[in-house]
């Protein structure tokens, strides 16, 4: 029984290994096909019609930039053939040819642009900065005093021992403080843009209703003699 289990497990392992091998071969073939399709047609003209590419005449969002240019070139070739076969519009056969030339120019323009960007990120690309006017970064970093990592403070947090240290270069200029405090600050009347001119005019001329227009705005008449805490009535007079 144990021998049968071992044989069955061995067969399963062989089957899985064969499947993995076929998957690797398929992925390799698929990647090589994608790399071969991503070649501009001037380097391999047969790529326009090889492996079913002759049906790809309209660009899609899944295509690369080179595949889009190849598809447009293929479309221009088909249009040129149609214009030549139809004698009535054979004079328009030059239009697709002009578009093909434009596609070639676009390819070389984008290719040069990408090559320049690649060189800019290359380590061997020469430095275009003016080193005479810019100090060396390493020298600047060596001159400055940086907090170093220690066992008791691995995150370089500010500790109580750091308070009051590192300020040896501060200038004790006692004249600057009162001079800056006596500076005149002027706040303009208009603090918004555009200014609130309409609100300002309403505040000046748009008076609220008075007692003459609305009696609810009139002050209530109160007789001081009958107020509850009238000092003239409640408090005793000196002669009493």
From Swiss-Prot:
Glycans are attached at residues 129, 157. The keyword Membrane applies. Keywords: Glycoprotein, Membrane, Transmembrane, Transmembrane helix. It is found in: Membrane. The chain crosses the membrane at residues 12-32, 66-86, 89-109. GO terms for cellular component: membrane. It is a multi-pass membrane protein. This is Uncharacterized protein R468. It comes from Acanthamoeba polyphaga mimivirus (APMV). The lineage of its organism: Viruses, Varidnaviria, Bamfordvirae, Nucleocytoviricota, Megaviricetes.
């Amino acid at each position: 029984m144990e021998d049968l289990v071992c044989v069955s497990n061995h067969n399963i392992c062989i089957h899985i290994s064969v499947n993995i091998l076929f998957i690797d071969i398929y992925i390799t073939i698929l990647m090589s096909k994608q790399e071969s399709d991503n070649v501009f047609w001037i380097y391999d003209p047969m790529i326009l019609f090889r492996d079913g590419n002759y049906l790809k005449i309209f660009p899609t969002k899944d295509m690369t930039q080179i595949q889009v240019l190849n598809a447009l070139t293929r479309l221009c070739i088909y249009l040129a053939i149609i214009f030549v076969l139809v004698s009535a519009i054979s004079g328009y056969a030059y239009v697709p040819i002009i578009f093909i030339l434009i596609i070639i120019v676009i390819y070389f323009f984008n290719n040069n642009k990408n090559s320049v960007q690649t060189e800019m990120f290359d380590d061997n690309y020469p430095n275009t900065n003016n080193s005479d006017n810019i100090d060396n970064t390493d020298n600047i970093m060596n001159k400055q005093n940086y907090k170093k990592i220690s066992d008791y403070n691995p995150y370089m947090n500010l500790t109580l021992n750091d308070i009051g240290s590192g300020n040896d270069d501060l200038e004790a200029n006692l004249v600057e403080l009162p001079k800056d405090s006596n500076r005149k600050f002027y706040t303009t009347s208009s603090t918004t843009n555009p200014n609130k001119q309409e609100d300002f005019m309403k505040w000046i001329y748009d008076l609220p209703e008075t007692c003459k227009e609305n009696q609810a705005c009139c002050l209530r008449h109160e007789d001081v003699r009958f107020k509850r805490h009238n000092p003239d009535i409640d408090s005793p007079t000196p002669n009493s």
